[in-house]
Swiss-Prot record:
The encoding gene: ZFR
Database matches in Pfam families: DZF_C, DZF_N, zf-met
A GO cellular component entry from the record: cytoplasm
DZF domain segment(s): 703-1073
Location of Phosphoserine modifications: S1054
Protein name (database record): Zinc finger RNA-binding protein
Primary location: nucleus
Lineage: Eukaryota, Metazoa, Chordata, Craniata, Vertebrata
SUPFAM superfamilies: beta-beta-alpha zinc fingers
Keywords from the named record: Acetylation, Chromosome, Cytoplasm, Developmental protein, DNA-binding, Isopeptide bond, Nucleus, Phosphoprotein, Repeat, RNA-binding, Ubl conjugation
Region named Disordered: 120-139, 349-377, 421-447, 702-723, 761-781, 1040-1074
Length: 1074
């Protein structure tokens, strides 16, 4: 005797391919089982593991027994494959069996095991099985030659399970394995599949054993099959692994009431009502199916090859199935009038905000109707009973009937088989009977939801629900409830609502249905309670209406908007003369709360209607819509993104400039190395190359073993191209910092604005003064101060790091005088205080014809404001007696030469911006030379304007754009040639009409010293010591790469050159290091 272990059994799991082959060889299936059918069947069960039917080795002596949870259930019979459990837990694996055309296959059970048995998780299927019978039969194939000692199974004598045609039964029977060589007894054993713990279902009622089955063809596989009765309903059962609903059989249909007990659901609440519906249907069908039991049992025995004989309780499974295809299960919500795709979606819908809001609105409607003893619609409202909505007029009702929502509800009700009310408009009346009907109709929805929802509930909830339904005392309530319950599936028979006979052991909480039932009870209690005083009515109404108030309505209520249109709100009274609601003629709406009335009169909708129909001058606030708010937020976000984009772009531009410089340095370094190589080739005594760069394409004379001549024209760069790196590095060190640039920009802009205010003040003063005199017209022609301009390094963009002095030129309409200078110096501090809170030190320098402005914060900047006038230069250029012109000057006129120099600075700045700013490398070289003039005393005597002219002429006269290194070398070459020496052509000033040498202020010694220094700098550049000219440390050379390059070339050249050539290369290396 091999005891049946309730916990787990060990099986050998072969591959699925071997299973199909063995089944096909041993005529296991009653029909041809092709590979395509197997694939289709395997695809039918998504939870199927890799292993197929559990097999035992033929040579194994020990007996293997498999207990598994059913995975797929057919309407014929449930053919299950045993799961393969090799260590501790058995995992289900369905046998892929093609079902008959008329038999709908159910989905598989995913495994969810406990420590001792198998559980069932939720499965989605087209038709639910009835609740499990008193026991389930467990068929076992074993190698033991004796009967197993498992306890027998007791079957209820009155419990019948339908089965479809014999063809479907044969398919299921064909899926069963043949017994072993020895006589194998198929016996029933209690299944622990519906239990969470180790407790099995026991039954103390009458016991019947299934007769032993004749021995058949030997099969080495040991399998266990559990046949679960399947009902032909379409109601799905969401069975979970940890739940066991407890069923109590009614005494009407069974001899003994058997109760299944187990642990409750922890997650799914959907199984109880479906099980209840199936159980009701099964009880109705049991009486009708007893007649065809014997014939169906005979057919089953014939198809299974007399494998085993079933007794009476199994004969009623052979009834014919429903011929039309079973429609898919539709989860319908009566409150929201929508359907859901599945139980999980329906459950999420019940927990959603939209459903809860409609549920609260339904509750409010019921409470209000119970309190007022009247409906809430307007006088002319037309009600659609199907959609449970009210329309304000015939046009609105006709539009609703034609609308998509109504048509969708009609289609759903047609599909569900529910009665569809007439589309004739139902005018809402104020009678008490209609109130009872309207109150009872939503009340029945929890019952229908309970039948449709597949939601687990407790027996107390069901009982309370029925109590709440009976308290109304309305006959139409029960009929509505019964109709909705029975009309869930189209092919489900009518059921008696004998709810107290079923004990529901389900989930811990049921939010939607429980709340609805409690709300119904509360509604009915309020309805049945007489109204003692009129004071209680507004309280109930206030509670009812205040729930759906939105924050926007509260904000409008709390605002300072005054209510308008009191005369257009009518009071609707009932037969007793009591105010039951208010009706607004403008908005065509009704409300039953005084607070809602005030809120409506202040609301934006009412005010818009009042403005449109009564008073167009009424100001209605523009409420930004969600779209407008989103557009504004999008604009702000895009603006921030744009600012961030430009900031990042500036940073990236700086980074690109640095990378470009680095790449250019790398490029010119490679070119320099190549150029050095060709220079060495030219220095060879027998090299065939002429002096200078390599010849054109295809030049002969390349010696064997030498690298080929570079193709194309000769590179334009000279050997000194590495100077660009030094020049750019030096330029980066002398360029002003960001803080210095910001400080310069700040003080210059503040000074310019302050001078503008000073000019306005002086102009006002002059106007007031001229109004008192006789020459008003003459004095009002020009302002005293015409404008301020930037000059010098500030206008040319030649600032260096550390420069603290910038120059401005203030143009005057008349010749500047000391009086005007003092007036400006006195008025400037007042205007500066208006513009900027910072303190500035202002000093009047009469000898310089300027005002000096110093900032008091770091970095301290100085602005020199020089006064001048174009009249001074015009008089100077005028032919005639100069003294006669000077007689007209005021006695305190400022220094004439200073004013002329300021005018010349204006011309120089204009010329520089037009000619030098756009020239490549010009500004960079001028900054380098300005730094050289500050560092080296010899160059300090070089006039800045002459240097700018020289650099511009040297770079612009080149045949091609010059790099910074080449431009610097070209400038030194020009100076070294003696262009600034006495007797040379010199540098004429292009901003003067008469010829004027810009080098006239330099002495001969200074000219010679600068020329000599330029020649020495040129020699340093030729010997790769430009860092000494620039006053910086040598930059780290890529000596490693350069040496590697030389070593590579030396290895190639050493094969075909003589010792002199190799010696020359060694000298070149030493020269480079030097």
């Amino acid at each position: 005797m091999i005891p049946i272990c309730p916990v787990v059994s060990f099986t050998y799991v072969p591959s699925r391919l071997g299973e199909d082959a063995k089944m096909a060889t041993g005529n296991y299936f009653g029909f041809t089982h092709s590979g395509a059918a197997a694939a289709a069947a395997a695809a039918q069960y998504s939870q199927q593991p890799a292993s197929g039917v559990a097999y035992s080795h033929p040579t194994t002596v020990a007996s293997y027994t498999v207990h598994q949870a059913p995975v797929a259930a057919h309407t014929v019979t449930a053919a299950y494959a045993p799961a393969a459990a090799t260590v501790a837990v058995a995992r289900p694996a369905p046998v892929a069996v093609a079902a008959a055309a008329t038999a709908a296959a159910y989905g598989g059970y995913p495994t969810a095991h406990t420590a001792t048995d198998y559980g069932y998780t939720q499965r989605q299927q087209e038709a639910p099985p009835p609740p499990p019978p008193a026991t389930t039969q467990n068929y076992q194939d074993s190698y033991s030659y004796v009967r197993s000692t498992a306890p027998a199974v007791a079957y209820d004598s009155k419990q019948y399970y339908q089965q479809p045609t014999a063809t479907a039964a044969a398919v299921a029977a064909a899926a069963q394995p043949q017994p072993s060589v020895a006589e194998t007894y198929y016996q029933t054993a209690p299944k622990a599949g519906y239990s969470q713990g180790a407790t099995q279902y026991t039954q103390a009622q009458q016991t019947r054993q299934v007769t032993a089955i004749k021995p058949a063809t030997p099969s080495p596989a040991t399998t266990t099959f559990s046949i679960y009765p399947v009902s032909s309903t379409v109601q799905p059962v969401a069975a979970a692994a940890t739940v066991v609903p407890s069923y109590t059989q009614s005494a009407t249909y069974s001899t003994t009431a058997v109760t299944y007990s187990g642990t409750s659901y922890s997650g799914y609440e959907a199984a109880v009502y479906s099980a209840a519906s199936s159980y009701y249907q099964q009880q109705q069908q049991q009486q009708k199916q007893a007649a065809a039991a014997a014939a169906a049992a005979a057919a089953t025995a014939a198809w299974t090859g007399t494998t085993f004989t079933k007794k009476a309780p199994f004969q009623n499974k052979q009834l014919k199935p429903k011929q039309p295809p079973k429609p898919p299960q539709i989860h319908y919500c009566d409150v929201c009038k929508i359907s859901c795709a599945g139980p999980q979606t329906y459950k999420e819908h019940l927990e959603g905000q939209k459903h809860k809001k409609k549920e609260a609105a339904l509750k409010a409607s019921q409470n209000a109707s119970s309190s007022n003893n009247s409906t809430r619609g307007t006088q002319n409202q037309l009600r659609c009973e199907l959609c449970d909505v009210s329309c304000t007029g015939a046009d609105a009702y006709a539009a609703h009937i034609r609308g998509a929502k109504h048509q969708k509800v009609v289609k759903l009700h047609t599909k569900l088989g529910k009665p569809i009310p007439s589309t004739e408009p139902n005018v809402v009346s104020q009678a008490t009977s209609s109130t009872a009907v309207s109150a009872s109709k939503p009340t029945a929805s929890p019952s229908s939801i309970a039948a449709n929802n597949c939601t687990v509930n407790t027996s107390s909830i069901a009982t309370s629900s029925m109590k709440g339904l009976t308290t109304t005392g309305n006959s139409s309530l029960n009929s509505t409830s019964n109709t909705k319950v029975s009309a869930v599936p189209t092919n489900m028979a009518a059921k008696k609502t004998s709810t107290p006979k079923i004990n529901f052991v389900g989930g811990n909480k049921l939010q939607s249905t429980g709340n609805k039932t409690e709300d119904i009870k509360g509604t009915e209690c309020v309805k049945s309670t007489p109204v003692t005083s009129a004071v209680q009515i507004p309280e109930v109404k206030q509670d009812t209406v205040s729930e759906p108030v939105t924050p926007a309505s509260l904000a409008v209520l709390q605002s300072d908007v005054q209510p308008v249109g009191h005369d257009y709100v009518e009071e609707v009274r009932n037969d007793e003369g009591k105010v039951i609601r208010f009706h607004c003629k403008l908005c065509e709406c009704s409300f039953n709360d005084p607070n809602a009335k005030e809120m409506h009169l202040k609301g934006r909708r009412h005010r818009l209607q009042y403005k449109k129909k009564v008073n167009p001058d009424l100001q209605v606030e523009v409420k930004p819509s969600i779209r407008a708010r989103k557009i504004q937020e999008e604009k702000m976000r895009k603006q921030m993104q744009r600012e961030e984009y430009w900031r990042r772009r500036e940073e990236e531009e700086r980074w690109r400039m640095e990378m470009r410089r680095y790449e250019e340095d790398m490029y010119w370094r490679r070119m320099e190395e190549e150029q050095h190589h060709w220079d060495d080739r030219r220095r060879m005594p027998d090299g065939g190359y002429p002096h200078g760069p390599p010849g054109p394409l295809g030049l002969l004379g390349v010696r064997p073993g030498m690298p080929p001549q570079p193709q194309g024209p000769a590179p334009l760069r000279r050997p000194d191209s590495s100077d660009d790196r030094y020049v750019m590095t030096k330029h980066a060190t002398i360029y002003p910092t960001e803080e210095e640039l910001q400080a310069v920009q700040k003080i210059v802009s503040i000074t310019e604005r302050a001078l503008k205010l000073v000019s306005d003040s002086l102009s006002e003063h002059e106007k007031n003064k001229n109004k008192e005199g006789d020459d008003k017209k003459e004095g009002s022609k020009d302002r005293a101060l015409k404008g301020v301009l930037r000059v010098g390094v500030l206008a040319k963009g030649l600032l260096l790091r550390g420069d603290r002095n910038v120059n401005l030129v203030l143009l005057c309409s008349e010749k500047p005088s000391k009086t005007l200078l003092s007036r400006i110096a006195e008025n400037l501090p007042k205007q500066l205080a208006v513009i900027s809170p910072e303190k500035y030190d202002i000093k009047c320098a009469v000898s310089e014809a300027a005002i000096i402005l110093n900032s008091c914060v770091e970095p301290k900047m100085q602005v020199t404001i020089t006064l001048t006038s174009p009249i001074i230069r015009e008089e100077n250029m005028r032919e005639g007696d100069v003294t006669s012109g000077m007689v007209k000057d005021p006695p305190d006129v400022l220094d004439r030469q200073k004013c002329l120099d300021a005018l010349a600075a204006l011309r120089h700045a204009k010329w520089f911006q037009a000619r030098a700013n756009g020239l490549q490398s010009c500004v960079i070289i001028i900054r380098i030379l300005r730094d050289l003039c500050q560092r080296v005393p010899t160059w300090s005597d070089f006039p800045s304007w002459a240097m700018e002219l020289l650099v511009e002429k040297a770079i612009s006269s080149a045949s091609s754009p010059q790099s910074p290194g080449d431009a610097l070398r070209r400038v030194f070459e020009c100076i070294s040639s003696g262009i600034i020496l006495k007797g040379s052509p010199g540098l004429l000033d292009p901003c003067e009409k008469d010829p004027f040498d810009t080098l006239a202020t330099m002495t001969d010694q200074q000219r010679e010293d600068i020329t000599s220094s330029a020649q020495f700098a040129l020699r340093l550049l030729a010997f790769r010591q430009i860092h000494k000219v620039l006053g910086m440390d040598p930059l780290p050379q890529m000596s490693q790469r350069f040496n590697i390059h030389n070593n590579r070339k030396r290895r190639r050249d050493s094969d075909g050159v003589d010792g002199f050539e190799a010696e020359g290369k060694k000298d070149k290396k030493d020269y480079d290091n030097f």
